[in-house]
Amino acid sequence: MVKRHKRRKFSGRVCEQIVYTVAGGTDPKTSRPKKPRFQTREEQDEFNRKISEGKLEALVNANFGPTSLYSTLTLDAENEVHTAAEMRQIRNRFYRRLLYKYPNAKIVIVYGQGKSTSRFHLHMISDGIPEDEIGRIWGLGSVVEIRHLREHNYYADADGNKIDHGRDYKALADYLHAHWRKEFGGHRYKASRSCIRPEPEPATEAVREYSPKHPPVAPRGYILVEARTTKYGYQYYKYVVDPRSEHKRNGSRLN
């Protein structure tokens, strides 16, 4: 007899919950969604890419917020490099210099290559490093963009309406994740050890019948912003801390 389990993962102010089918007698503490069967290598690669993408989304959401900085750093003509291996060395040296000066800083850093210029550059999200220090420690070119992460991030729902997800930085994380190319080799991103790595809670048995039209109840203080059944056979739900409650709290401080 098959059963359904549900499992939540909290990443900062975002909660993701999946509901999936398991064989009867499966221990909820160790259960996982059944891995799908793939017809082609491309399908498997796409599945693995989505898993990797989701991990970076959770990492960014768990560690960064409006006090954090997003920066883009470029190389000047004197320091320009032409291979991914050279750029990876530059990234690693910069990363080590940042942590030498700010050992408790949280950092996620990627390198990419411009589509039109083919020039390498870095993107970084950081917390605990002063804005003026980023350019000083970089020292190999320009900081062409540096800004704080947004308090409110809007995403289109199934009907095209823009919904406030608050501190859900999925779009930024996906943008960084997409910079990696297979020919680069190595890992898609580098994250400091100080970053929290979110892990899902142990699963529990789903005693009710759920569907995107009848989702699990949101955790207290959260609202449902996404509900769907995936092509891999499990249900996916996303909840965020209600951004309206943030408006109320921020407003009360001003009174």
Predicted regions and their residues:
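Calcium-binding loop positions in Ca2+-binding modules
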Residues: 121
